[in-house]
Amino acid sequence: MRTMSQALEQFAGILTTRFGSRLARVPSCCGELTYEVEAEHLLEVCGELRDDPECRFEQLVDLAGVDYLEYGNAEWTTNEATGSGFSRGRATPPAGAPAGRAATAEVGRRFAVVYHLLSVTHNRRVRLRAWCAGVEPPLLDSVTAVWQSADWYEREAFDLFGVLFRGHPDLRRILTDYGFVGHPFRKDFPLIGNVEVRYDPAKGRVVYEPVAIEPRTLVPRVIRQDARHAPQAKDAADHG
């Protein structure tokens, strides 16, 4: 009986034969094969992974955007010394690797999209990573023509990371407000946000205002003085 690792290696050989240089293997994680595909080959490779009898990845389980802006860098700068840091997930690069970057992230590339595929036919999973073409905006072809389930997943990656998916039938925000400024999962997005939103009863509508808090380091809780603490709001709550 083959072990799981033997079965994975056998299937890895099948993928190498079938796709050649279009798929580049990277270190596996959690017993799941992981490959990189260049942006120009993404659509054709995904279509073949779905249709090839030895692959039959009929289902896109999930896709997610990734921002590698700070990946592999040292601990965050703080105002005070810390003996243990924040247990930040970072990899130690091997000898000869560029300083400050982990081995699995490439210098000069910032945004990527990761696809998790499932073959119901063969009971297999595989993970793909495609680096976006360009940085601002990051671009990739939409895979909605291959897997319809990619529709809302790609909208989420666009909303949170700003990835533009060419050929998507309805690429618009899905989680944030329509007037939201920026993409909140980017590593350079301010933790305090860009604006504050509240309902103004006098105007009868939602209003946008400058952020009233300041970013601070090593402060787990910030007590804000905003509209909820205004005297009229407190009186209304007390007598409501």
What are the residue ranges of the model-derived segments?
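Terminal low-complexity/charged segments
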Residues: 1-240
